[in-house]
Design a protein with these regions (language model features):
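Conserved pre-ATP/AMP-binding loop-to-beta segment of ANL
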Residues: 10-13, 129, 144, 154-179, ...
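Conserved AMP-binding/adenylate-forming core of the ANL superfamily
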Residues: 11, 15-70, 87-92, 145-150, ...
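Conserved AMP-binding A3 loop
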Residues: 27-31, 168, 175-201
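A short helix-loop-beta submotif of the ANL/AMP-binding
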Residues: 41, 53-54, 60-80, 84-88, ...
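Conserved S/T- and glycine-rich ATP-binding loop of Class I adenylate-forming
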Residues: 55, 72, 103, 174, ...
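Structural core segment of the AMP-binding/adenylate-forming
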Residues: 74-152
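Conserved ATP-dependent adenylate/AMP-binding module captured primarily in the ANL superfamily
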Residues: 86-119, 200-217, 248-262, 335-337
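Conserved AMP-binding/adenylation subdomain of ANL enzymes
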Residues: 198-216, 223-329, 340
Length: 359
């Protein structure tokens, strides 16, 4: 899928990620995305990974997670993401349960947790570290950094093997095992095949006609979450630019920097947005506060009491709504960072009625 999109879009930006040292968003083109996936796929062969084996990804959301995913799929491998906040004991359980041989880790926390578990995981052979700033344990003689891993695939020395494996790939192949967070007992693995994703993409192609390759999606939820993982695959399939938010706590900042048209999230995100707006209104006084309260009232009447049930709003109500749309609503959306919004899928729990009405 990535290689096909590279042929179509070339040097158009496919991914962006935030460089925390420079505070700049770094673009990755479709060509670079494809090239890195090919290199990583060759590197996996160089490591001796056999078809239909399990590899793990223990990291925050990073471009390397996607590089590794698609490189694995090219080799008919199964990727198993671990929550970035998993303890050493939780990581150990999943590594042993899935018999993971190679584990890709993000930053210092994940490396430390994984290395602590290493001696208790008999299948585990090597850690591959995304972040070059990670300090290795003095006892560690086997781990390598991701750039060293990619160097194993430089000039694509095993491309014939990769292409042979890709040719043998089937929708019946296992794509991921997604483990639950383990908050109510031992984590449980959910097996997802490629046909699961293919069918999800097929039906979304039919239903989400408003989604185009002009859209920009904020990757906010962890890629260990099936909602975000499937959504990101859909975005890649549709040629949507994906901007990767590394640290969940930073979303209020990054969403204002990117101002996405798309973002999947959970109700809790919108609850926080709603609470923030209510707090802002409470701090206002006089005419400004009265206008904000009236704008919310007008919006609810216009969209919920009339449009949602197929009625035409009265002219005066419609004119007030249009006025607020260019003033109060525009200000609130810009303050949040969603003024360019196309749509924002939300799942995981029911969204409270007052939040739905507000949004």
């Amino acid at each position: 899928m990535v290689h096909r999109q590279a042929e179509k879009y070339g040097d158009k930006v496919a991914l962006k990620y935030r460089d925390y040292e420079t505070s700049q968003w770094i673009p990755i083109t479709w060509n670079k995305f494809s090239q890195t996936v090919r290199q990583a796929a060759n590197a996996l062969v160089a490591l001796g990974v056999e078809e239909q084996r399990n590899i793990g990804i223990f990291s925050q959301n990073k471009p390397e997670c996607l590089f590794t995913d698609f490189a694995a799929f090219a080799n008919r491998l199964v990727t198993i993401p671990l929550y970035a906040t998993s303890s050493s004991a939780q990581a150990q359980y999943i590594i042993n349960d899935a018999q993971i041989r190679f584990l890709f880790v993000g930053e210092q926390f994940q490396y430390d947790a994984a290395f602590s578990a290493f001696g208790f995981c008999h299948s585990l052979q090597k850690l591959i570290i995304f972040d070059r700033n990670v300090v290795l344990d003095p006892r560690d003689k086997t781990s390598i950094y991701y750039d060293e891993f990619l160097a194993l695939g430089k000039d694509l020395p095993h491309n014939d093997v990769v292409e042979e494996r890709t040719a043998r790939a089937s929708d019946e192949d296992l794509a991921n095992i997604l483990y639950t967070s383990g908050t109510t007992g031992e984590p449980k693995g959910v097996m997802l095949h490629h046909f699961n994703y293919r069918e999800a993409i097929r039906i979304h192609d039919i239903r989400l006609t408003a989604m185009t390759d002009k859209d920009v999606s904020m990757n906010f939820l962890p890629l260990t979450h099936v909602f975000e993982k499937a959504w990101t695959y859909l975005c890649i399939h549709r040629g949507v630019q994906v901007c990767i938010n590394l640290r969940p706590a930073d979303i209020q900042t990054t969403i204002k920097e990117i101002r996405p048209t798309l973002m999947c999230s959970v109700p809790r995100f919108w609850e926080k947005v709603y609470a923030g707006v209510q707090e802002k209104i409470a701090q206002e006084t006089g005419l400004r506060k009265a206008m904000m309260l009236d704008a919310i009232k007008v919006g609810k009447m216009h969209n919920i009491d009339y449009l949602r049930v197929g009625k035409t709003p009265p002219l005066l109500l419609h004119l007030k709504y249009k006025f607020y749309e260019k003033t109060i609503y525009a200000l609130l959306k810009k303050t949040i960072g969603i003024e360019n919004g196309n749509f924002f899928p939300t799942a995981g729990a029911a969204v409270p009625d007052d939040i739905c009405e507000f949004v």
